[in-house]
Amino acid sequence: MCRIAGALRTLLPLLAALLQASVEASGEIALCKTGFPEDVYSAVLSKDVHEGQPLLNVKFSNCNGKRKVQYESSEPADFKVDEDGMVYAVRSFPLSSEHAKFLIYAQDKETQEKWQVAVKLSLKPTLTEESVKESAEVEEIVFPRQFSKHSGHLQRQKRDWVIPPINLPENSRGPFPQELVRIRSDRDKNLSLRYSVTGPGADQPPTGIFIINPISGQLSVTKPLDREQIARFHLRAHAVDINGNQVENPIDIVINVIDMNDNRPEFLHQVWNGTVPEGSKPGTYVMTVTAIDADDPNALNGMLRYRIVSQAPSTPSPNMFTINNETGDIITVAAGLDREKVQQYTLIIQATDMEGNPTYGLSNTATAVITVTDVNDNPPEFTAMTFYGEVPENRVDIIVANLTVTDKDQPHTPAWNAVYRISGGDPTGRFAIQTDPNSNDGLVTVVKPIDFETNRMFVLTVAAENQVPLAKGIQHPPQSTATVSVTVIDVNENPYFAPNPKIIRQEEGLHAGTMLTTFTAQDPDRYMQQNIRYTKLSDPANWLKIDPVNGQITTIAVLDRESPNVKNNIYNATFLASDNGIPPMSGTGTLQIYLLDINDNAPQVLPQEAETCETPDPNSINITALDYDIDPNAGPFAFDLPLSPVTIKRNWTITRLNGDFAQLNLKIKFLEAGIYEVPIIITDSGNPPKSNISILRVKVCQCDSNGDCTDVDRIVGAGLGTGAIIAILLCIIILLILVLMFVVWMKRRDKERQAKQLLIDPEDDVRDNILKYDEEGGGEEDQDYDLSQLQQPDTVEPDAIKPVGIRRMDERPIHAEPQYPVRSAAPHPGDIGDFINEGLKAADNDPTAPPYDSLLVFDYEGSGSTAGSLSSLNSSSSGGEQDYDYLNDWGPRFKKLADMYGGGDD
């Protein structure tokens, strides 16, 4: 009985919640009021409130679902409100009277409209072990035990019982924590036990949803549950003693969240697009719309039903479509869909849960746009029964007439595009009709020339169709056929020769003035009185003339079949015929003269030059004949030698091989090398035959054993012509002139060099040499030198020191050079001598100085040097007074030096 009572207590909240949801849904449909549905929200809490602990959930009624509401707390330091209305603790604090009441505000983000509701928190009474023992109204779950078969005492059973799941409705309004069940062990009479639960929702994320009193074992839920987030919780209950030792095996507790109708259906698309052909029969499928509901699909809360709320436009019937209330398939239910009248329908589709219950179910809407597609239910119709046009004769690819049609189908579709055909009046296919892709007009075009003299008018029967056949039951009206009357305009046409070309046969050799034929043209314009005149357009050999009035053709020169203007025995001449119409027209005709051959060309020998040996053997000359005539005025030919001069037949003999070839051989045993002209008589087979004496130029030469001319004979025989000799002489003369000019230039250069030479011996002229000497430091070996040549600066007269400027050393001065006195020798230059002696002594005593006493090698200065070696150079102490007069003979470049050291009293 206790368990039954507990089960009833569990079901009562569920039934109450269902009843409350039904009432709320009914009230919402009847009259929805935006704001908080409750005046005061209350919750029962423990004394200690922890940071982040969910306290309660406040609901806000948003009737149209479009408001965006923001929540605020009047005590923001202690409480905060999430977007879903869940109230959390901002910090940890003990619950007291000052926290018992506060306000929650809801404000519309767009309109700034504001609502408020009061929240009341009450302190849950503290449970003691005595109060727990006295509490017997809450359903208990006892850890299972059973009797032993042997002892009859209570023992643990080997297998746990299966605890029935706890059903808890979602969105419960509390107060929280809400007691669910009490877990108890029958060993609590002897031991002090502590109870705990583990699993998702307790100590695993999301934590804190379920809590248990460790002393009483009371299991509670701390906040409203949401089945759409978690539909089932699986917890495990544990019982331990005060030392933490396990007293009972853990038992499984399953908590099922009972679904509430708290979610409206949502369409996958807010706007659905579909098409249906016009003229569709009832029952034609159009499209499918789909909505989903987050509630339990196996319960009424998630079972959706569809219906059409409205249709726009409502023609021809307000109920043109219907929808399957379970699948969302939209089909046609009425006939009369006509795209030309209504091109698009807009349906408002509603999806309602609770199997479409309008009282308790939640609804949502979407839009279905149905486009009526075109079919070929309107044939093209001509705007007129007869169309007119005209065309000049002999003109093609011109538009004669425009055929216009109307079609009510959708433009630029196969059901609208027109196709024209000619059904009568054009047996020879001279006309065609093309469709203008933009205007859909038919363009009647002439494709073959029309002769006015043959047909002056055409009456065409044309029909218009579409690219696709008409829909079933639609027939072509009479307006789909029309007549086109085409008038042909006469124009001046070109005269024409008949036949063209005209062929005549004539023998060559006709004399000038011979009338060959009459070549006339015809005027196709029979209804115009016009005259034709003739002129010659092309006559390559200028053999013909034509009468401008009657067209008679006469020769003005002898016709020759062998002329280069004759190809394959045919001579072509072109003539022009012109009328006097407006505008004047002309035509050309070709006269082909087939020339018959006569024997008017004598044969000639081929080749005209040949070679043979001085002896008859082993060579012979093969010859043939060239005749510009053709059979029978050509071969076979007869070959013979003339009687004079007598040396021809004495030296040569000719043998006829066949009708075209003969062989020429030496008759005598030896003929001196040279060039001989042998006349040969050749006669053709014409009637009468024609003969000719042709000269064969034969070169007789010395031959080798093979019968070939030797190279010596070829070179001698070749010789040099006058032009070659003149060219060789000119080359020799030019070469001699170049050599002579080179010799003259060399002579002139030598003279210039001699004019520039100095008066001194060339061997002593070393002015142009820049001599580099090796290192000569360390002092001279020859220290016996005359220091009298060194002059102190104070011995020079002040007047002699004058600035003369800077000039080139090879420049000849144009004014008198200053004269300097001859330096007097200083007999005892003590200062310079002491300086040199001190330096010499220091060098001799320096142990780090290099051994300059060794043999020193100097560069060779050439044979032009006055001193053959350095040892032959004279110093100031080697002799008496030095003679520097020879410096005056060295030219202007040494004049400065000669003036300084030359003899002179001053």
UniProtKB/Swiss-Prot annotation:
Q: Which UniProt keywords apply?
A: Calcium, Cardiomyopathy, Cell adhesion, Cell junction, Cell membrane, Cleavage on pair of basic residues, Disease variant, Glycoprotein, Intellectual disability, Membrane, Metal-binding, Phosphoprotein, Repeat, Signal, Transmembrane, Transmembrane helix
Under Gene Ontology molecular function, one entry of this record is: calcium ion binding
Task: Tell me what happens on changing D627G.
Answer: In ACOGS; decreased function in cell-cell adhesion
Keyword Nucleus carried by entry = no
Q: What is the effect of changing N601T?
A: In ACOGS; decreased function in cell-cell adhesion
Glycosites: N190, N273, N325, N402, N572, N651, N692
Presence of keyword NADP = no
Report residue numbers covered by any propeptide: 26-159
Q: How does it sit in the membrane?
A: Single-pass type I membrane protein
User: Tell me, how does this one assemble?
Assistant: Homodimer (via extracellular region). Can also form heterodimers with other cadherins (via extracellular region). Dimerization occurs in trans, i.e. with a cadherin chain from another cell. Interacts with CDCP1. Interacts with PCDH8; this complex may also include TAOK2. The interaction with PCDH8 may lead to internalization through TAOK2/p38 MAPK pathway. Identified in a complex containing FGFR4, NCAM1, CDH2, PLCG1, FRS2, SRC, SHC1, GAP43 and CTTN. May interact with OBSCN (via protein kinase domain 2). Interacts with FBXO45.
Job description of the protein: Calcium-dependent cell adhesion protein; preferentially mediates homotypic cell-cell adhesion by dimerization with a CDH2 chain from another cell. Cadherins may thus contribute to the sorting of heterogeneous cell types. Acts as a regulator of neural stem cells quiescence by mediating anchorage of neural stem cells to ependymocytes in the adult subependymal zone: upon cleavage by MMP24, CDH2-mediated anchorage is affected, leading to modulate neural stem cell quiescence.
Name of the featured protein: Cadherin-2
- What species does this protein belong to? Homo sapiens (Human)
Q: What is the lineage of its organism?
A: Eukaryota, Metazoa, Chordata, Craniata, Vertebrata
